[in-house]
Amino acid sequence: MRHVQAEPSPSSEPEAGPSQPPVRQGALQGGLLMGYSPAGGATSPGVYQVSIFSPPAGTSEPHRALKRQAPPTEGPRELKRGPGLGAREGLPPEEPSTVGLLGPEGLGLGLGVASQHFSHRGLCVVEQRSSVTSSWTSGTWSPPCPPSNASCNTLHTRDWASPDPGGHGSLGESPGPAPPGQLHTLDTDLHSLAQIGGKSPVAGVGNGGSLWPRESPGTANGHSPEHTPPGPGPPGPCPTKRRLLPAGEAPDVSSEEEGPAPRRRRGSLGHPTAANSSDAKATSFWSHLLPGPKEPVLDPTDCSPMGRRLKGARRLKLSPLRSLRKGPGLLSPPSASPVPTPAVSRTLLGNFEESLLRGRFAPSGHIEGFTAEIGASGSYCPQHVTLPVTVTFFDVSEQNAPAPFLGIVDLNPLGRKGYSVPKVGTVQVTLFNPNQTVVKMFLVTFDFSDMPAAHMTFLRHRLFLVPVGEEGNANPTHRLLCYLLHLRFRSSRSGRLSLHGDIRLLFSRRSLELDTGLPYELQAVTEAPHNPRYSPLP
């Protein structure tokens, strides 16, 4: 059983005029009924209230609409927009007019009816869903909308709200009170503008007769209503929509013309990731000489003053490395600083020669079979002795030079006193390879006549390859180390001199002095410590 209780009307005769709701015959069939109140209304001026309902399946009775009473007229009020403004101004809350639907026998619509209640004031849209057993009444519903003098006459609907030719409207209307938990704000799709039959139901509106901006229901500034939320309206009686720019996009306020944005200027220089033209094997040795990652990449065609300065600094850094790689033998320690350094460097930190003699390099292998014959001459001639030599080779091919051999002759088998020699004389050390062929004969002259008892010292004998004609004043950077002999001397408490500890040798894989085609010749240099020259025994 269906029952609808209608709101009693104060007058039995319908009033003609603008207070009559413009009800069309097809509104009942289409399930859409609209009420309109002109400007100057006392209770709810400028208000549309639309109710949409869905009848149950199989219901085909024609519906009739109740007429809405005309609200008493009242003087014009100040234009207020937005919910809650009337309450702040001290105005009493107002109730909009309602429209109801009745069946043929005065009965309401059946069970399962869902109604949607629309009030067009500041785009306030509320959906009401009734319960299954609730009866439909024409009670009033007061949205928190302030009064307005401007009456907007365009119904917000969609194209699918047109009347159904078959007489079964998919949408109907029947306003009524609903529980607060069943009020839902509809999606912004219902705010899209539509034209009824291609025309507006009212030609003009108040406030100077300005018209509502007409747009197609599917577009709003080139965007669909689903993706375009309503924005703040213009200074007119009706709100409008504005396009929202995507995130990260800023409007161009300087010019209205559309065109390509100006190209941003790129950075001047980047950061290098590796050396330009370097030996891959030498990276571990002279990587500290290369420019850091913050230095710019050098362009070969760059002729600017900055480019010339950078290339000049690069040449200063790499010049000692080029001379280091060109040498055929062992090289003297190169200068790692681009500024000029003294000809004689006394530092031993990081020295290639000292590192080899002290065993700081990891050996790559050992060779057995080398021997050394030791002899001396002077005030007396001690007996010659032959001792084995422990030969170790190293892999220093990143220096682009022949890998040297380190030979160590242990003198401990000769006793605690070592190999006795005169205080002034010559020491001869002959090195033999496993085939018993002479590799090199060293002759070292010494004079330790002023050496006190219980002291010690050493001699370091070097053989360099120097350019021909520069024997006397050869530049240390032009000398190539070929052989080295390190001897340790010690004086006993009685004043006798002897070789002790061990004898260390550095030699090349091949005999460089036999290569007559090289424009170099051998030069022997013997060095001893000074200041102090002798050190006391521990």
Curated annotation (Swiss-Prot):
Entry note about domains: The protein contains a transactivation domain (TAD) which may be required for transcriptional activation of a subset of target genes.
Region (Required for macropage invasion): 348-430
Species the sequence originates in: Macaca fascicularis
Compositionally biased residues, Polar residues: 274-286
Gene responsible for this protein: ATOSB
Family from the record: Belongs to the ATOS family.
Span of the signal peptide: none
Low complexity: compositionally biased ranges: 1-18
Pro residues: bias regions: 227-238
InterPro entries the UniProt entry points to: Atos-like_C, Atos-like_cons_dom, ATOS_Transcription_Regulators
Location within or outside the cell: Nucleus
PANTHER family, alphabetized: ATOS HOMOLOG PROTEIN B (PTHR13199:SF12), GH03947P (PTHR13199)
One Gene Ontology cellular component annotation held by this UniProt entry: nucleus
Main location group: nucleus
Keyword Phosphoprotein tagged: yes
Protein name: Atos homolog protein B
Modified sites of kind Phosphoserine: S254, S255
Annotated segments matching region Transactivation domain 1 (TAD1): 436-444
Chain residue ranges for the region called Disordered: 1-103, 156-185, 197-308
Keywords recorded for this protein, A-Z: Nucleus, Phosphoprotein
Record function comment: Transcription regulator that may syncronize transcriptional and translational programs.
